[in-house]
């Protein structure tokens, strides 16, 4: 397997299906894993596994919240982090899964990496980091964003960068979609500190344990 998000996905898959991850090794540009059916030294019956999953879900149902951040717009990004921080303040374990245009929110600016021609074209056309995000409405070639930030400053509204740091301080987990990163030519070195890379199985593993699941 060559997908970098596989390491988190396989762990989440084993946890949710009641199987055992015996080993996970990296070999140059690929990963090799060894799985064992069941947990530990004993195989788990389907009935026992179902009971375990139901119990785990019941125990954590009120504690988790997940957000899929698909949009790369400034206003939607701010709403995402406000909700995430609010949920964390209420005692929930919060996971934000950034995919496609949402990946621009968690990028660092001016990071030099080796890219193909198409990947370089994507980089040129996309915002460099969170400070360059457009508005979803009335952007007007960037003028709307400038005016919005001015109004926010005048009214003492926290900036997106502050909201992101506040969410990190509150323990919000941020995961970047490995498949979307590959499609859009974004490399792990370009992500801000503290962001993990994972796939859809990683997100679903978190989503099944929560009663708040949002798509923004």
Tell me the role of every PLM-derived stretch.
Residues 66-77, 151-155:
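Short, glycine-rich nucleotide/cofactor-binding loops
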Residues 32-46:
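Core SAM-dependent methyltransferase catalytic element
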Residues 141-206:
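A charged, amphipathic interaction segment
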Residues 3-19:
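Amphipathic alpha-helical interaction surfaces in cytosolic regulatory modules
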Residues 7-10, 104-115:
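N-terminal beta-loop-helix "entrance" segment that forms/cooperates
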Residues 78-92, 96:
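Histidine-anchored nucleotide/phosphate-binding helix
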Residues 1, 94-100, 175-178:
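Short internal beta-strands
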Residues 19-25, 114-152, 156-159:
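A glycine-rich helix N-cap at a beta->alpha junction
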């Amino acid at each position: 397997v060559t997908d970098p998000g596989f390491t988190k996905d396989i762990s989440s898959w084993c946890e949710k299906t009641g199987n055992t991850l015996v080993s996970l090794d990296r070999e140059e540009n690929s990963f090799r894993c060894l799985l064992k059916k069941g947990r530990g030294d004993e195989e788990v019956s389907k009935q026992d596994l179902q009971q375990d999953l139901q119990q785990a879900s019941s125990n954590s149902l009120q504690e988790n919240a997940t957000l899929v951040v698909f949009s790369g717009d400034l206003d939607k990004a701010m709403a995402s982090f406000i909700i995430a921080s609010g949920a964390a303040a209420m005692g929930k374990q919060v996971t934000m899964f950034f995919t496609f245009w949402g990946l621009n929110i968690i990028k660092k600016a001016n990071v030099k990496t080796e890219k193909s021609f198409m990947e370089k074209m994507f980089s040129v056309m996309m915002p460099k980091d969170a400070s360059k995000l457009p508005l979803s409405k009335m952007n007007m070639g960037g003028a709307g964003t400038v005016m919005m930030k001015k109004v926010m400053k005048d009214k003492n509204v926290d900036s997106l960068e502050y909201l992101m740091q506040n969410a990190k301080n509150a323990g919000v987990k941020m995961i970047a979609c490995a498949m979307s990163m590959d499609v859009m030519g974004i490399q792990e070195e370009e992500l801000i500190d503290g962001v993990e890379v994972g796939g859809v199985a990683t997100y679903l593993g978190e989503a099944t344990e929560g009663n708040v699941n949002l798509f923004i």
